[in-house]
UniProtKB/Swiss-Prot annotation:
InterPro entries: NAGPA (IPR018711), Pectin_lyas_fold (IPR012334), Pectin_lyase_fold/virulence (IPR011050), RHGA/B-epi-like_pectate_lyase (IPR024535). Coiled coil: none annotated. SUPFAM superfamilies: Pectin lyase-like. This is SPbeta prophage-derived uncharacterized protein YomE.
Amino acid sequence: MAGFYRYDQNLDKYVPMPVELLASEGEEYTAPKITQKFNEVETKTTEILNKVLTDDRYFTVTSSFKQDATLGIEYYVTKVTPKTTEAKKSMVQKTFAYDFEKSIDPTSSYFGTTNRETVLSMAKRKRSVVAINASGWRSNGEVMGLQIKDGVLYKDYDAAGYTGAEACVFFDDGTMKVYGNREVDADILISKGARNSFAFGIWLVKDSKPRTAQMTTWADLNVKHPRQAIGQRSDGTLVIITVDGRSLRSSGITAYDMPSLFLSEGCINAFLLDGGGSSQTAVEGKYINNISDGIERAVVDTLTISYPDDDTDSRFFEVQEGRGLATSLNRRVEFIESKPTWNVLDLGFSPDGLIDNTAKFKKALSDLSEKGGGKLHFPKGTYLIGKQNTTSASEKIELPSNVSIVGERRSYTKLLRNPNHSLDELLRITDHNYIEGIEIDGNSSVNKSSCRLIAGGNIKSFKMKDCSLVNATDRGVSIHGIGKSITIEGMYISNIANECINVAEGEIIKLIDSEITFSGTALWVGNAANIFTKNNLAKSLKTFVRYKNSQNAICSGNIITNNIDRAIWGSVREAVFSDNVFKQCHSDYHLYFIQEDTGTNDLIVTGNSVYSDVEGTAFIRTPSDIDRRRVSGNVGNIPSLNLD
């Protein structure tokens, strides 16, 4: 069976989508060339989506990928056209994050918690066809501005004089209107039928006229960022525009340039929603835009588009094995036959940690390769692997393309390196490999020969999640060719002699939500683009991240403590380092940037907390000839916290 389904009301079951609506397995699309003609470039993937998402009974949904050479942006236009008056009235809904819906008293003067929820999670809870981030929120989780849900006032406008959070209001008849802060009192809006409201702003278009004044409410309005906004045509069609940003392909857009996009789409009203890393649009259970954080961001509320409550047809569906339309409607569409899942105990593997499983492992992988891929499931136990007493490359354990290995969880399932294994790699990866719930132990206390736990050459799409990498005599993961889309998530990494993750060259590299301790460098990247290190705990390392001739990096939310050397160093362009905690660096600087071959420029270093008892340690050193640097808003007890 294929991996893409829709509900068939006559058959009362989910059925595969017709093959002609989807690309063949492995088909890839390159981004179209940018043209000077405004608003005209669309990909073949767009055409596929337009066919998939049409439903003539309630509304139609189309999503288009576009480029604008003059503005230097890539963006997505999602249009929702109601087919009936009732659909126009009911299709827009407001969804608060979990805790808001469970515990908030709408009569209270304040509501906010640090708990938030992802756009996709809210979409799945509400079975929404389209879901987008909406209102802005403060660091304590308090939602901004006027908040009306289902005709009930949850929160009034922000204090008089605070003009940032304006209002986008949907009325009982489905009409969308936009207002400045406190332009119309909340009780008057509700008396006129206000049903749901969203707050951020500014409004961009009102009564078919673009905003030309009071565009300085917030300083960032005239700065290029990823942006999310919504508009409405006179016929009730909603137009959602999501602009990518903070990347080589798309620089982002200012608020000043947004009205023209909506006027070109025929909108009579338009409103700027929360943007930046919060800019996220999910259509039929998948994000269609490139999220600038590299991972989805939890938010306080969403604007969702759903079918009527009594309808069971054409709702969004679960995509089998995480496949189907790609997370960006831009690059790749897959149509995949179901792959087998084999329990290794059924194949004669021994989980006692004493008997070598190398031959059986290689045989199982070879058989899965002949079937086009699949999954090996490792129940609880310790599995000894690694050919002993040989240096022959043919004896390496290689995961074929489209093969996954999955354990019970990392504290239950272990792959243990043989004491007499002498090859320089324990596992070799190829394209589209996935490893989850397994501890991979290099057995360095017994086997002293140099060995990388996982290695590969030119790799497309490799992910490790909820695994452990421990006791390696060399690197943890080593990509010595070009690595594209490498994700290391939710890991425990310890006692790795050299780099925990090393990518010689590549793009879209993520180290997120992991704990890394007592090792060399957590992440080493060279000639790489789009590098994300977020929400990691790094303790007692040599270095957290070493960049070499890299660009487009986001490093945020990490706690980095007790490094032997500098926490972050190297050469990187167009990088943001924010909201990290740096403690006890045993070197001259926590952050140390150099020029190397391609140089260091366009750095933003802000919102970090920096503390050290080591005498002589400063926060940051940048090259004297750096272009565009902002080091501000940092706190701590050492010199050079704020250079600008």
